[in-house]
Design a protein with these regions (language model features):
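Cytosolic regulatory regions of ion transport systems
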Residues: 1-103
Length: 103
């Protein structure tokens, strides 16, 4: 089974994670907002409250060496950039880091 991480559970990230879970994809969902993580946990098993800018935190929840990671942090461009940088440092084998921000 393919595993995809979704970082950021705003409108876009929430629906991407939910849709992927319906396609028999293992989803690891991450956000720093407890309410958003609780909402998505109704649809997927691996949902975590995490500071996505922390390499150590991402590694602890299993976000390393994945083929695809989707970053959907929204309007906080700094957090989005720092998250992508942490992923690049952490995931030497990651083939796709998809980023969706609103600027």
């Amino acid at each position: 089974m393919k595993t995809i991480a979704v970082i950021g559970l705003g409108k876009f990230g929430f629906y991407v994670a939910k849709s992927l879970s319906r396609l028999d994809v293992k989803v690891i969902a991450v956000d720093n907002d407890e309410k958003k993580v609780h909402e998505i946990s109704e649809f997927i098993d691996d949902a975590y409250i995490v500071d996505s800018m922390s390499k150590q935190a991402l590694q602890e929840v299993g976000i390393y060496n994945l083929d695809t990671v989707i970053v959907s942090i929204g309007e906080n461009i700094e957090a989005s950039i720092l998250t992508v940088m942490a992923l690049k440092d952490l995931n030497n084998n990651t083939k796709n880091i998809l980023e969706n921000s609103q600027v």
